[in-house]
Amino acid sequence: MARTIINNKQVFQSYVLTTAKYDFSPYEKRIMYRLIELAQKEIEGIKLKDNLRKIAPTNFGREITMPVSDILKDEQDKHYTIAKAAFRSLSEKHIEYEDDEVWSYTPIITAPEIKKNSGSVKFYVFDNIWRCLLDFTKGFKKYELITAMKFKSAYAMRFYELMSGQTKPLFVLLEGPDGLRERFYLQGSMKK
């Protein structure tokens, strides 16, 4: 069963992550939402008191422990089929970064391990991914965590992130290198 959240807290997501080009499943998005939530708690200095969630520094980043139920949306996942697929898929995805001096290609998460008796998952996040979650140099989007977690579609989640708190009309091209089709990996899937 999914984790119950009493307060619909606001989270801040890096605009770099909001506008990035990627194709995630809703469960992969929920893993990312939980990472953003944990990263913000760490920088705010909030201690995790429930003994179910942990952020432990390592030589290369963070070791994250959390309940598998944190990524579910009112479903039962008795044999961890949904969770295994989501963590496996996200561990196969990378963030590619390049500027004038550096090129890097880093997995988003590594070594996911589900402990079936306790219902928890442990995985690792490299420092440059952790920093990306907290990179507000290009701005940020603020949205309600519970609302974002409730959507069934990854596209609905992405639109919610883009539109949340928007007071002026948002003009985003449909076509082109920064268009919605390319950002959402929908090239060739819809008729013009």
Q: Where is each model-derived feature located?
A:
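Charged, alpha-helix-forming regions
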Residues: M1-K192
